[in-house]
Amino acid sequence: QLPQDRETLFYFNLREIPPRSDKPNVLQIALQTKIKLFYRPKAIVAAPGTVWQDQLVLHEEGNGYRIENPTPYYITVIGLGNTPKQSESGAFEVVMVAPKSSVQVKSARYATPYLTYINDYGGRPVLKFTCTGGRCSAKKA
């Protein structure tokens, strides 16, 4: 039984290996594909256009941030920086934050952090955060 209060993540791994050819000078290519599949229960389906990623909270900890995800959805964070441009193209190790959990990331500290994530449509929106007392919240657009 899958949880009904949060998304569940599955990976579909596919390896395509062509049959051995008896012809000389043949180029054969083996492909491996990994697809992420998300099961989203009816109980948590959001209206189209709803932005739940702005509920993320950044906590200043150690030599970076702890990204807290209080939502029932997986969120893939692909950038964190001091400006929107740095967040979109800077050096950052991509992390996927599971529903109702948190993950630690190494990063410089910023007065106004910007975070880039991947939405349901493959877009890469940027969130601006404001920090108070080591806790950073996304500003509503």
Q: Whereabouts are the PLM-identified features?
A:
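Terminal connector regions
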Residues: 2-40, 112-141
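Asparagine-centered strand-capping/turn motif at beta-strand->loop junctions
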Residues: 65-71
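Short acidic/proline- and small/hydrophobic-mixed sequence motifs that coincide with surface turns
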Residues: 72-77
